[in-house]
Amino acid sequence: MPRYKLVVEYDGTAFAGWQRQAADRTVQQALEEAIERFVNRPVRVHCAGRTDAGVHASHQVVHLDLDREWRTDTVRDATNAHLRPEPVSVLSAARVGPDFDARHSALKRHYRYRILNRRSPPALARGYVWHVPWALDAAAMHAAAQTLLGRHDFSAFRAAECQASSPLRTLDQLDVERRGDEILVATSARSFLHHQVRGMVGTLMLAGSGRLDTAGVRAVLDSRDRARCGPLAPAAGLTLTGVDYPEAALSAPG
């Protein structure tokens, strides 16, 4: 069966996350139903990162197997036609070999978190930022973030319901910068624990507020205690922005 790789973007506001659920609408369900309507057979899609309810994606990667060859532009355009009016869009489709796996072939995942740091609440960006109305020091947040880089036990930032077999992760990037009224947090790793990014952002917010210094943020990490973590940053500010793969994994078959 030919395998296809799709790059997908979506607004997570209306969805109960990526993964199919019995009652609530999810991104996986919307995408599978759209593809099934044009290929006229059951389809299962597999993603690079299972985003939570309210989390967005500008570059989610999925793979799926179809029972015949289709032009890649047909896969993209027909899926988008059947997705309307869902806030989901297939940006590209490509043929890949049978060994490509959107999740297991990934080398690195990239996320961005947006904090709106001003007194006035958002009107246009509501649903896409965390509004923090008190002053934050982005430079202090960035300095504290650097203490989290490398391979560590990230249990302090892990959700209680996280199903990962190990809390060890290698954090490759955690940068914080201010752009006008917004503070942007960019982070990259091969994989993250459930709620890890949002837990780190909430803790860095405390550093920006002056409630934790750099050593205090590192102490949270070293404690391995979820109770020491800052508040869980809201899902709305988080976007999956990219997934990296080795070139060999992206090669077209034949």
Curated annotation (Swiss-Prot):
- UniProt-listed Pfam families: PseudoU_synth_1 (PF01416)
- EC? 5.4.99.12
GO process annotations (BP) = tRNA pseudouridine synthesis
**Which residues are substrate-binding?**
111
Q: Which catalytic residues are annotated?
A: 52
Q: Which GO terms describe its molecular function?
A: RNA binding; tRNA pseudouridine(38-40) synthase activity
Under which main EC class is this enzyme filed? isomerase
Catalytic activity annotation? uridine(38/39/40) in tRNA = pseudouridine(38/39/40) in tRNA
Q: Which UniProt keywords apply?
A: Isomerase, tRNA processing
Q: Where are the transmembrane segments?
A: none
| Main function | Formation of pseudouridine at positions 38, 39 and 40 in the anticodon stem and loop of transfer RNAs.
Subunit-level organization:
Homodimer.
Annotated family: Belongs to the tRNA pseudouridine synthase TruA family.
Q: Give the protein's recorded name.
A: tRNA pseudouridine synthase A
Species of origin: Methylobacterium nodulans (strain LMG 21967 / CNCM I-2342 / ORS 2060)
